[in-house]
Amino acid sequence: MSVGFVGISDGWQDLSQNFKLTWDYTRAENGNIAMTGEIDLAACEGEFVIALGFGGIWSEAGQQVRATLLDSYDELHKHYVGQWETWHEGLMKLDSIPRERDLYRASVAVLRTHESKDFLGGVIASLSIPWGFNKGDEDLGGYHLVWPRDLVETAFGFLAAGAETDAVRVLRYLESTQEADGHWAQNMWLDGRPYWMGLQMDEAAFPILLVDCLRRNCPSTLGNLKRWWNLVRRAAGFLVCNGPVTQQDRWEEDAGYSPFTLAVEPVVAVPGAGMILPGNGSPVLGSTITTGILTPAAFFLVT
């Protein structure tokens, strides 16, 4: 087994040059690394177990691996599969057609797989890095970041499949990552630290849509609506004070009046906030949102 830097001293470089593994580097730090090993399939009769551990230091990772290997593989497998089966049993039965069953179940499983185990409700956009083979060590973000827009759309997917608790969990995550002025970062690490620093107004509007959608479709799972009024109040206030123009649209990141942003921002999210806020602690802002600032043209008309 050997560990090395990708493109320099990794196992592929060894194999392509020597046609067998000849390197045995035991350490590689501060870079994009790859580990390569060789297993004697004859000696193990074709069966082997690989345990992979992570930690801040080598001893922590080693302890994780050792603890796992001491457990029964069959019991761990049964527990893991059982958790997935239990979750799927709670979803809507949309798989009556055998040909489409796997597509539905696989799709919702992909959504659930992208949720963090440490930051519940935090669902990254993708476990991939686009054009990964051409990326260097400095391209850390990729798509394994949280985009508030994609996160809300994932919550809509959960809700459509009947995973109401999962959708509400997403809202709780958004509640904890909202900026003081009411908006959300363009994208962020799971712990809420902003990555790209752009401002996309639709991403300040989408969480309001999620609150309203949950309010209408699963009020008992959402719980007391008053809990969310502060999130809605701040987001709606940000939209009213800064919209409808956006610093960036969702794809090309151009500034101006984006049709997509306009569709989400004043047409849907702001009236939705107007229905949520009155009677939930902010009648003045609720009135402002439903009637416009000074005149309806100040916010709702683009010429």
Question: What name fits each language-model region?
Answer:
Residues T36, E47-V49, L151, A204, ...:
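Extracellular structured ligand-interaction cores
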Residues W84-W87, W147, W251:
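Signature tryptophan residues that serve as conserved aromatic anchors
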Residues F54-G55, A160, R216, V302:
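Short, well-ordered loop/turn and helix-capping segments at boundaries between secondary-structure elements
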Residues K117-G141, Q178-P194, A236-S258, V270-G286:
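Glycine- and aromatic-rich loop/turn segments at beta-sheet edges
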